[in-house]
Structure formats: structure tokens, C-alpha cells
Amino acid sequence: MLADGEVGTAKKDDDAGGFFFTADDHEALIHRPKPLADEAVPSGNGIAAFALQRLGFLLCETRYLDAAERTLRACWRALDEYPHGHVSLLTALEEYLEHPEVIIIRGDKDELARWQSAADKLYAPRRLVFGISRTEQGLPGALADRKPASA
């Protein structure tokens, strides 16, 4: 979905925001559904908005944050009318309104384990901690710019 650098182009609704259930190259349908409500599984749009936000925060990529915001805006009426049926969208909205704290740790394997353990000890539900090896190559986005300190 993101390999070409685009945000879900085959399922994205460029006009209204959000994502359709089927790709644009799918057989012709009378109605192209865009699921918003959670059922036995969470809504694809709720999960997409949540994942795009997390990816945007991690990589410092506004295109992912913008796509998440457009999805939330497209779903606003459904959220307003029946919030209990849209928990995955509410979760994404909550994180949109109160951004997470992102901690990226680069270092050797032993250092990573120690720092991650220390960061995880404090209860912080809005904290995302990522440990990336000092030797990791080919990182995307802003992660490539964050070089580990010299040993």
C-alpha cells in the first residue's frame, strides 16, 4: 500500500477522504462501500487513520498525517451520530487530538534493551518507544536522518 510512497492510492477516496472497501480497479459495482462502523472487526477506516497517524509521527511525514486527518473528517458525521459504533475511529481521533510522545532510541542491542526497559517502566499510554539498531541501514523518512551517536 505504501511501497510507492503514496497513501493507499487504489482504495483512497480523493474527493471526500477515507478509504473504500474495494480498490478502484475492482469490477464495476453499483455501490462502492466505505466502511466506517466497527463490527466483528474494527473499521478499516478507523485502523487506517490510526496506522497512518502512527506512521506519520514515526517518520515525520505530513502526507500520512494529512491522509489520517482527511479520513477522520470524512467520518465525522458518523462519529457524531453514533460514537459507540465507531470505537476504532474514536481511538484515532483521540490520538489526533492528543499526539503521542515518540521516543526513538538508536544504539547497540544491549543499550536498546536497557533504554527501552527504562522507558517502558513508567506508565505513559501516549508514549511510543522504538528501538533501532545502530547498524540498521536503509531506514525510511526522518529515521534515516537520525544517526546514532558515536560509541
Segment roles from a protein language model:
Residues 1-151:
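Glycan-recognition and catalytic cores of secretory/periplasmic carbohydrate-active enzymes
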